[in-house]
């Protein structure tokens, strides 16, 4: 409890606003809360979010289709500035513009702590908004094109839901490889 002013000031510094869920359900289960975030561990960074990505998987976590331990934060991807680093983090510094995807759901927050290995620097010319919304789609596309099946220029690909987020990234990436792409879309 932060009953004294000096304690309140310390607690205020450690507190951040976050959307959390305490039970599964519709949008009505989303709660704005103040949480004590603390400081990053040795291999972690604290990021002040500037933009977050909204994904279907967030609704799956919220509804219980993809169960999470409750109470839980929500959201997997975002972008912002590093405001604190752990003692063993070497390739990132305070002030770096970064994006991330993954970790425990908690992107819907002013700040969050992440393993440094989940964070990438944002290249010059890419906004926080673009970086925040492309991470999960880009990683999914990379997995499909490079891990599931190594696509080459002689391949013909049928991609369902080509107008969706992953479909748009996949289509452009597949085209850059030189393969023939056939895309379907819903009505």
What are these regions (language model features)?
Residues 36-53, 63-106:
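Glycine-rich beta-strand-centered segment in the early N-terminal region that forms part
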Residues 98-161:
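NAD(P)H dinucleotide-binding glycine-rich loop of Rossmann-like/cofactor-binding domains
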Residues 163, 171:
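N-terminal Rossmann NAD(P)H-binding glycine-rich loop of SDR-like oxidoreductase domains
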Residues 166:
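Hydrophobic/small residue at the entry helix of a nucleotide-binding pocket
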Residues 175-187:
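Adenosine-nucleotide cofactor-binding segment
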